[in-house]
Every structure is written in structure tokens, then in C-alpha cells.
Design a protein with these regions (language model features):
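Glycine- and acidic-residue-biased ligand/ion/polar-headgroup-sensing regions
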Residues: 66-67, 76-96
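Short beta-strand His + acidic residue motifs that chelate non-heme Fe in jelly-roll/DSBH
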Residues: 71-73, 91-92, 113, 118-124
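Double-stranded beta-helix
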Residues: 24-26, 100, 120-148
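Short acidic-glycine-tyrosine-enriched beta hairpin
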Residues: 95-115
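Solvent-exposed coil/turn segments that connect beta secondary-structure elements
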Residues: 68, 88-89, 116, 126, ...
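A short, N-terminal "cap"/entry segment at the start of jelly-roll beta-barrel domains
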Residues: 18-59, 102, 145-148
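Bacterial N-terminal signal peptides
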Residues: 5-15
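Conserved short histidine dyad/triad with adjacent acidic residue
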Residues: 59-76, 105, 114-115
């Protein structure tokens, strides 16, 4: 009887640790998630690292801009935290893309764009990679439809 009890205890401990491992954090390795081109904005690629922005959960979106890519003025229904990972991102606020009204945001810097605030970004000096996080649902709503 004692042997059976020890065996059951060992199985329970082993099964418990397996369940704990399955429910623990699951790292996302960005290099394993492919970028997808965004046809509305040539030169812009993105990939969802956490969530999809479609529901009321947290999300993390990675964006890559080819040199001189301009993301036209747009808004989001949620506030977004943006961290520049590489390159220098030029950001402006307003309903018109104004190259004289941009501010340079270097790699490592973070800024917040409040919900509903029209803004635009530009990879003026070369390729830029940044990531945005927030709580969905989210979307891009262009002030004017981007030209092809």
C-alpha cells in the first residue's frame, strides 16, 4: 500500500509540474514571426507579437519602415506607447503631413500618443523599426485615404 501511495504521489508531483510549465510565460521570439507588408502604405511592414488588436486585450505590434516611408496622418481609438528600436523616427501631430513640424525620436526613446490624436511618422534618414503597445481594440483610421 505504501508503494502505491508513493507512486501516486510521484505521478501527481510530475503532472503538477508539467501543468505549471504549460501555463507559465511563453516567450515570443520576434525573429520567428514574419513581417507582413501593408499594401495601403508602401514601405511599411508589421507583425503582431502579442495579441492582434482586435479585442479588449493587450497587444504588442512591431513595425518596420523602409527609408523615406511616410505613414500619413491617422488616429487610433486607444492610446499607444511607442518605443523606437532602431533608426530615428520622425513624428508629427496634426491632420496634415508637415515635414517642418516633425520631431526626431532616436532609438531607445519612448513616446505616448493619446487616443484619437492625429499623427504621422516618417523614416526620413533610413530604415526604422519600432514597436507599439496598448490595449485593444485598436485600428488605424487615416485622416484621408493614403494615395497608392
Amino acid at each position: 500500500m505504501r508503494a502505491a501511495w508513493l507512486l501516486l504521489s510521484a505521478i501527481a508531483v510530475t503532472a503538477g509540474s508539467a501543468v505549471a510549465q504549460e501555463t507559465g510565460p511563453k516567450p515570443v521570439l520576434p525573429d520567428t514571426v514574419p513581417f507582413e507588408a501593408i499594401p495601403q502604405v508602401p514601405g511599411l511592414e508589421s507583425k503582431w507579437l502579442v495579441g492582434t488588436g482586435a479585442d479588449s486585450s493587450l497587444y504588442l505590434l512591431r513595425v518596420r519602415l523602409a527609408p523615406d516611408t511616410r505613414l500619413p496622418p491617422h488616429t487610433h481609438p486607444d492610446s499607444r506607447f511607442t518605443q523606437v528600436l532602431s533608426g530615428t523616427l520622425y513624428v508629427g501631430f496634426g491632420r496634415t503631413f508637415d515635414t517642418t513640424a516633425v520631431r526626431s525620436i532616436p532609438a531607445g526613446a519612448v513616446f505616448v500618443t493619446p487616443a484619437g490624436t492625429p499623427h504621422f511618422v516618417w523614416a526620413r534618414d533610413g530604415e526604422v523599426e519600432y514597436q507599439e503597445s496598448g490595449e485593444g481594440p485598436t485600428a488605424n483610421q487615416f485622416v484621408e485615404a493614403p494615395s497608392p
